[in-house]
Amino acid sequence: MDSFKDLLKMQELYILGVSGGCDSMALLDMMNQAGYQIIVCHVNYHLREDSDLDQQTVEAYCHRYDLPCYVREIDKQVYGPDNFQDQARRLRYQFYLEIGMKYQTQKVVLAHHQNDVIENIVMQLQRHNTKGYLGIQEISEVFGVTVIRPCLAVRKQFLRDYCHGHNVEYRDDYTNFQTEFTRDYVRNVTLKDYDEEKIEKLLKWAQEHNQR
């Protein structure tokens, strides 16, 4: 992808957040095969009975290619009763920051893709929050680290197809198909009413908005 050359440099060292899903496993393989210097970080929240299999998938890939891999296992008892996603996000970025300090890098690469952008725009519209940037930025500062997202121009299916075409093992998180959280509801319910033409119009409108 052209965004790799635009956003990533061979001489830099990157923290790569990998969940074990097709998005991050595809990005992991792309960066590894291209020769980028990467340190893999995986967070196991132990919220699903099969979450250890996600961890094993990430560890197996890293072992195969002799890549440094760090895992943060979190006791689910630390979660408060409300807003798990925000709590998980803070814990995840704290982990990235700790590993980044160990290796003297503040650059974190994540596998957000165009489907995530579309979901973000829809959620912003639902909240009437359209004054700032719509969607997801390729580069942003989050909790003390610089986050780089080189996959925003491609759809999730592209990353899934990449895994199939390159024999990259990945895991599907069944909770992504539920509707408990707002993002999951938007993905699995709201966007079912959006055809490709409507999605393209939405993306074009957001792009024009962000260029003002």
Located regions from the model:
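ATP/NTP-dependent adenylation/nucleotidyl-transfer catalytic domains that generate, transfer
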Residues: 181-212
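Core alpha/beta nucleotide-donor-binding catalytic domains of modification enzymes
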Residues: 1-188
